[in-house]
Amino acid sequence: LPSDITGYSVYNSATGETVEISDAIPYPTWDEDQDIPMMRQPYGVAGWLDGDKALLVYDRYDIWSVDPAGKTKPVCLTAGEGRKTNRRFRYIKTDSEEISITPGREMLLSVFDYTDKRNGYATMTAGKATAPDIKVLDTYTFSQLRKAKNANVYAYQRANFNTSPDVWIAQNNNFRNAAKVTDAN
């Protein structure tokens, strides 16, 4: 089985060149815990920045900006915070019509803490290398997130082994003070 595919490459149809774009990321971009006899699966891609200026890829913990031409070094957009805190950050696409990610805009992230298994949400600025701003990190599972089209309002489910899945509403990324709008049992 092939075992040498360990990153991302870009094919330039105008020149016929293939460029390995993730080799300079100092950490694996594939699931290093995978122990079944098949090609290793990548952690995934968050998306492209506007104008195909960069591809955002994941390692086990963090989000990296990679130059599709391979001319500049990859930048860890989460500033290594995931690896430092043993947390996984992943981009949540909240606009179904989004084609690319606009640099400078706020990105909503899911957070998973490998140490204590807490989940939550964080935000970061697209294209800027800074530690994500944790909005909520708790012992619940957060799912079914939906964003209002023209407002900074989110609806989502929150549940754990002791509480049924209820719908909560958060305004202006204030997930810590979200309002519970259902009462499931």
Task: Describe the role of every protein-language-model region.
Residues 18-41, 75-98, 182-185:
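Surface-exposed loop and turn segments in beta-propeller and other repeat-based domains
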